[in-house]
A protein has these predicted regions:
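Short alpha-helical elements
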Residues: 1-173
Length: 173
C-alpha cells in the first residue's frame, strides 16, 4: 500500500523512517495504566513520515509502553527490513526496546524528548506526525470512541480507516 503512494508523491519507494507513540483509547476496563491513569486499551502505531500506518497493535492498557513498542518492532522487522530510524516518545526509552532494536540490522531508535523548560502544550518535532494520524482516526465514527469488545475488532477498524486514508490520498494525486 505504501509503494504506490510513495511513488506518486515522488518519495523513495520504501519508508526510511517512522514515528511511534501511544494514545489512550477507551472508557471501559480492559486494563489499567497506572502511569497515565487510563482504564481500557492502548494503541501502538508505527507510521511512515507521511502519516500512513505501517503497523498498529491494540492491547490492554496494563501493558507498559516499552513492552508494546518491543512487540511492534518485533512484528515489523521482517516486513520492513529497509527501515532505518524510528522516532519515539520517552515512554519507549527502555532496555527491552533497545534489545529488540539491536536484533534488526541498520535500525536505530531516536527518543524525542520534551524540554524541561517548556510549560504547557508544545509541538514536538516528528511526534506531531503520529498525533495527526490518531486525529485522522478520530474522525472515523467507529474510532472516535472505543465501543468494541475485542481488541482485534478495534485493530480491524483502524486498518479500514488506514485504507480509507491511503485511497483518499491516492485519489487526490
Amino acid at each position: 500500500m505504501h509503494t504506490p503512494f510513495n511513488q506518486s508523491a515522488a518519495m523513495p519507494a520504501s519508508p526510511a523512517s517512522s514515528v511511534s507513540q501511544t494514545p489512550d483509547k477507551s472508557d471501559h476496563g480492559v486494563g489499567f495504566d497506572a502511569g497515565k491513569k487510563v482504564k481500557g486499551r492502548k494503541v501502538h502505531a508505527l507510521v511512515d513520515t507521511e502519516g500512513l500506518p505501517l503497523r498498529v497493535i491494540v492491547h490492554s492498557a496494563g501493558i507498559q509502553d516499552r513492552d508494546g513498542a518491543a512487540r511492534v518492532i518485533e512484528r515489523i522487522r521482517h516486513r520492513f527490513p529497509w527501515l532505518e530510524l524510528i522516532w519515539a516518545d520517552a515512554g519507549y526509552h527502555a532496555h527491552q526496546v533497545d534489545a529488540v532494536v539491536a536484533k534488526v540490522p541498520c535500525l536505530r531508535i531516536e527518543i524525542v524528548k520534551r524540554s524541561d523548560y517548556m510549560k504547557g502544550f508544545v509541538v514536538l518535532p516528528r511526534r506531531w506526525v503520529v498525533e495527526r494520524t490518531f486525529s485522522w482516526f478520530g474522525r472515523n465514527r467507529r474510532l472516535a470512541k472505543d465501543f468494541e469488545n475485542l481488541a482485534d475488532t478495534l485493530a480491524a477498524f483502524i486498518s479500514i480507516a488506514s485504507i480509507q486514508l491511503a485511497v483518499r490520498r491516492l485519489a487526490r494525486m
